[in-house]
């Protein structure tokens, strides 16, 4: 079949309207980064979530951030903190109180995603958690986070994990 000339790529054509805009996954990644920082602040300073959210929205450019996802994480994690911490404890050989606060924030965020956002594949949850730990955590913190999330996934996403091992 001969292609019509109009189907050919022309480098002089203007870019599509959405060219250069971050993808949904990129916006979510940025939301997770800010949420990790906000959860760390919540854990350390015990300020109200609304105060923290307002501060983050003033202090950060949310143009390339999924603001709704940021809010969902920031308010969602504390809402089920006891459930999250109960799920994490059997996967670690260290008490939650002894954990680095940054790694704790990452683990809580990732556990929340396992529990509440089943639309996000478990492998994505693990990968995003590891990446957050690389950015914000201690030198080898990402290895610890990876190990914990790897142990946690089968208990919170059993069917999905089994289906992916076939």
From Swiss-Prot:
Q: Which SUPFAM superfamilies match?
A: NusB-like
In terms of superkingdom, the source organism counts as Bacteria
Q: What does this protein do?
A: Involved in transcription antitermination. Required for transcription of ribosomal RNA (rRNA) genes. Binds specifically to the boxA antiterminator sequence of the ribosomal RNA (rrn) operons.
Q: Which UniProt keywords apply?
A: RNA-binding, Transcription, Transcription antitermination, Transcription regulation
Q: Which GO terms describe its molecular function?
A: RNA binding
- Gene Ontology CC, one term: cytosol
Point to the regions of Basic and acidic residues compositional bias: 1-18
| Family under the similarity heading | Belongs to the NusB family.
Q: Where is this region: Disordered?
A: 1-28
| Protein name, entry field | Transcription antitermination protein NusB
> Organism source for this protein?
Pseudomonas putida (strain W619)
User: Biological process GO annotation list?
Assistant: DNA-templated transcription termination; transcription antitermination
């Amino acid at each position: 079949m001969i292609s019509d000339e109009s189907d050919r790529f022309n480098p002089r054509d203007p870019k599509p309207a959405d060219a250069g805009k971050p993808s949904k996954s990129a916006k979510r990644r940025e939301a997770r980064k800010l949420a990790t920082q906000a959860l760390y602040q919540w854990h350390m300073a015990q300020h109200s979530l609304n105060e923290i959210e307002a501060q983050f929205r003033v202090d950060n450019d949310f143009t390339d951030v999924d603001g709704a996802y940021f809010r969902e994480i920031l308010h969602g994690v504390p809402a089920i903190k006891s459930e999250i911490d109960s799920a994490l404890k059997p996967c670690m050989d260290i008490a939650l109180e002894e954990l680095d606060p940054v790694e704790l924030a990452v683990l809580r965020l990732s556990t929340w995603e396992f529990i509440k956002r089943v639309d996000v594949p478990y492998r994505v949850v693990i990968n995003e958690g590891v990446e957050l730990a690389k950015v914000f955590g201690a030198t080898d913190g990402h290895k610890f986070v990876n190990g914990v999330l790897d142990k946690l996934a089968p208990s919170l996403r059993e069917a999905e994990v089994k289906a992916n091992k076939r």
